[in-house]
Amino acid sequence: MYRDKELIIRPILEADLSELWSLIYSEELPEWKKWDAPYFEHKHVTYQDYLKTKDALVNQDNRWVIEVNGEIIGTIGYYWEHKPSNWLEIGIVIYKPAYWSGGYGTRAIRILINHLFTTMPLVRVGYTTWSGNERMIKVGEKLGMTMEARLRKCRYYNGEYYDSIRMGLLREEWESNPQFK
């Protein structure tokens, strides 16, 4: 568990599953999905089926909840793109619109990046977003990340093409960036 004032990121507990299911699956077209890879279908999962995945969610090192003042507002985590070369990517979703543009995502990502570079022999941490999610691009810029790739017009959503964006931070950039201290 890590804390930055009222914001906490911590492993998912079994007691969190009902709230997480509600945030992710209770609505057919949730507002958050308009920003989190909306070009991929959001498939409804019943609560019973969601509970069948609890072993992959509860107390895992790679997927945590984000809390503000004790309220779960999102999830954050990482996945291996290519483990033999220590290449991982991070992901975040703030499910509750009331918490968008409040700096919570930036702070949570900063905490996770610190955790990853401190506990793993990584040379790079990155994430992929799309040009329709300008807030996520700005988060990376605020954290000193580099736009490493812009794959033009490869994401299609609501009748428009968007770019896929890759942001990355190298260990030496993390070490020299005072906001990570």
What residue ranges belong to the model's regions?
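A generic alpha-helix structural signal
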Residues: W21, L51-K54, I113
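Short, charged low-complexity linear motifs
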Residues: L17-W21, W35-D36
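Short loop/turn motifs at secondary-structure junctions and domain boundaries
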Residues: K54-N59, M145
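Conserved GNAT-fold acetyl-CoA-binding loop/helix
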Residues: L29-K52
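Acyl-donor (CoA/ACP) binding surface of acyl/acetyltransferases
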Residues: M1-E19, S26-E27, R63, E67-K181
